[in-house]
Design a protein with these regions (language model features):
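Redox cofactor-anchoring modules in respiratory/redox and cofactor-processing assemblies
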Residues: 1-171
Length: 172
């Protein structure tokens, strides 16, 4: 049975099966909390955990951050740490509020679309799959069992842009 749709690539939204009636239109997608982005669509059944999918999307976005602006570089790192804690059923009080605060800061102060859209997958997943998040946070269990076991998540933001540091070292 269809559970979720993830649209627009890693920065896109995670939508519920109820969203199947939405047209692939910029305005309708934005109203639903998603974007068309790259045009990619991931379809997930009942065996897919929305928290785990969100963790994978956030990990990709964090890894792809260029590191030039503070809100995205540190914001994505913190969002990944929190999302991983939730996926491991080890969340701390205030984690969701902290995610909202970090996401809001990124949306208003990141220098490019990557940082400004980086909170989108989390926001839409929280909106459409709050039951999955509640199971991880309150019941300390993954409803699908999909978050159990070790996972490889790259945790390196690209090296900070040293080419833009003023001084003689750039002449080398």
């Amino acid at each position: 049975k269809l559970k979720l749709l993830q649209t627009g690539g890693p920065l896109g939204g995670v939508l519920s099966a109820d969203s199947m009636s939405i047209h692939l239109d910029f305005e309708e997608m934005r109203e639903a909390g998603a974007i068309l982005g790259s045009g990619g669509i991931i379809v997930g059944n009942e065996d897919v955990c929305a928290v785990d999918l969100t963790r994978v999307l956030v990990a990709f976005c964090q890894f792809e951050s260029c590191g030039k602006c503070f809100p995205c570089r540190l914001g994505m790192e913190h969002l990944l740490e929190i999302t991983e804690r939730i996926a491991r059923c080890e969340s701390q009080p205030g984690d969701l509020e902290l995610m909202q605060s970090i996401g809001g800061t990124m949306e208003t102060s990141a220098l490019c679309g990557h940082g400004q859209l980086g909170f989108g997958p989390i926001r839409s997943a929280l909106t459409h799959f709050d039951d999955d998040f509640k199971a991880h946070i309150e019941e300390k269990r993954c409803p699908t069992g999909g978050c159990a076991g070790p996972r490889f998540v790259p945790k390196n933001t690209r090296p900070f842009a040293t080419d833009f540091v003023p001084g003689d070292q750039n002449a080398r």
